[in-house]
Amino acid sequence: RDQPRSRGLGDVYKRQRLYRLPVEQVDVVIHRQSIVHSLVEYRDGAMIAQLGTPDMKLPIRYAFTWPHRAPSPDTPLDLLTCGDLTFRAPDLDAFPCLRIARQCAKAGGTACAIMNGANEAAVALFLQERVGFNDIPRLVESALSRVEVKYAPDLPDILEADRQARAAVLQTVGDMV
């Protein structure tokens, strides 16, 4: 999957919920070198970043060994040879799922469950070559317009929203044929 789409649908919502932040305080920054894995800005403006080689072995290893840090057999990041680190704001026209993710996180309720279910169904259809890559955000938005958002949901409400979103994507694709 493309990184900004993945970041929009997963990371914005996870950070917002995990740290109990308003969605306006969670930013996505495009960093093509994939060396800065996370960044926290403090109230005083200071920032702390976690840097590493551009692969997922380290975070996966840490997930399995937490709260300890296991020694890595891999070569560590060398700041003298890794090159420049660049950052830019995402283009919300180029990455519409990021805009959708922000709207859903702000809406609350089952909106994120609808978004996630619709995205998973749309990506599955893309991988089956039944829809184009650029159809994914349109299918997600269509599901969001067709499935009612419930506020203060319980687990059955969330699971039902996911099911309805997946069905809405399949119905929309069926209507396109």
Which residue ranges define each predicted feature?
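Catalytic, metal-anchored helix/loop core of enzyme active sites in primary metabolism
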Residues: 1, 10-177
